[in-house]
Amino acid sequence: MKKTFKGVIITSALLAGLFIGGYQSQHVSAKSYGKAVTKIAGNVNYAIYHNVSKGGPSGKFTSTEYFKHGQIQSKRYVSTKKGNFWDIYVDGRHVGWVSEKFFTRNTISLAGSVSVVKNSDYSFPTRDAINYVTDSHGTAVNPNKVKVSKAYVSTSSSTVDYSYGKAKASLNIDVRSGKGEMGEANLTPKSGFKSVTTWNGGSKSSSRNWNAAHHYTSETSSNTFRSNGLILRTRLFQPRFVSLGYGQAGDAMGQVGVIPEGITVNGGIFTTSMFTSSNNQHGHLVSYNLNAIKSKYAAQNLATMRWSTFKSYAKNIKVSPYIKLGHGQSLGSSSSYIYVLANDNKYNNGPRSEEILQIRKSDMKINKIWTFRIAENRYIHNATFVGDNTMYALFYNGGYNNYEYWKLTRSGDSWTATEVGATKGRFVSNSPVQGFTYGNGNFYIGFNDHIFKVGKNGTAKKHYRFNVRREIEGLSANGSNLYVQFAQ
């Protein structure tokens, strides 16, 4: 049976409202911070309280079980006879007071394993393996402040020691030969599409309400965009921040938003990469359980929705630590893991290796890291993942003006590359690729207001043209659906 795709729109960078909490510290001085610090949850659940006093907390009203995978921040804590208690915000919403014992303290969390392909032209930065680091209060510390016994690993396996204050950890970084992993580009390109132009740079428009004329308010009606048989319908309006907003976090680790770069959807779990700046290579992954989050609109208003609704949403939204994501546009996922090609989009081409991250969906932490190369003088900017052992990559060969499609298959820690197709032309002459995915035997390549459908061998099939005038920030194919993320 011939399979067709239905389009689904994921819209990002919308408004999250303001909520002012009324929970108090009574008769005790609080240690306050000018800007919020980021806290890292532990594995044990603790009660959350309305109030604290010198004698301890009172007014228990909920548990941390709903919030431990969210973005947790705080601007103050108090010392009581029962220990320190922190006044926490979760995903940008004021929640209440919790014991400092809830946070993981004096801890360095690292990837479970790292396998580096031997390459004298590239050195793996060992701090890229850090999930998070915490001090004695459970406050997150910037990975750059961690001392390492070796900053880079390139051609020989090494055990690297990490330390910050009382926190210590070590990691064996394996270097494999990479023999037989790289492929050769030897396929004849298929005829391509007629080249078109589009607008360049940032979005030229916005959703209905996210503009000055409507005072940057939340969306209340969905969108439908049609082209050449492809129909895109809104599935979710994301919150602008999944944290406190502009200027409220003490550093880049705290703010989750506002720049989306890539998406992946698998089994109803939608994940996007979020950055504070387009120049950052570290950021956060945010996962939404669409099986539980049925509303298209409610997630925009995490800070103002009913408390019972917020608890449910908080349990179904997960935020990763502040980790290396590279450009963050190339994502994929399986039932258990999220995959990221953590490449450098400012590096045009050359002999450098690239990083693949495997991140657990369960706790949003890095499980494995591999570095790889697909072929001589080919650096990948766009990729997608199918299951746990397959990556498809897109490479634009400027010298020959064609796109190459590569399949990388994992066996153990080796990623073996094979060219599977090629297409003549650049498709859009004045805009970079904004999204790339694979589904039902076809590649989908997104540019601003354009999506191209290409057979696995490079056969040009369909060109979808839109007039949305908002940046596409990632594509993902899952089942019969094609998911498209629009900014603004």
Residue ranges with predicted function:
Residues 1-28:
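Sec-dependent N-terminal signal peptides of Gram-positive bacterial secreted proteins and lipoproteins
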Residues 29-87:
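Beta-loop motif signature
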Residues 31-54, 106-140:
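Solvent-exposed, low-complexity, repeat-rich "mucin-like" stalks and linkers
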Residues 89-107:
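Boundary regions of SH3-family modules and the immediately adjacent low-complexity/disordered segments
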Residues 137-180:
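Serine/threonine-rich, repeat-prone extracellular segments and beta-strand-based repeat modules
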Residues 185-254, 266-316, 351:
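Beta-propeller domains
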Residues 255-262, 323-330, 373-388, 426-437, ...:
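Repeated scaffold domains used in trafficking and secretory/extracellular systems
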Residues 278-297, 346-358, 399-410, 448-455, ...:
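Structural motif
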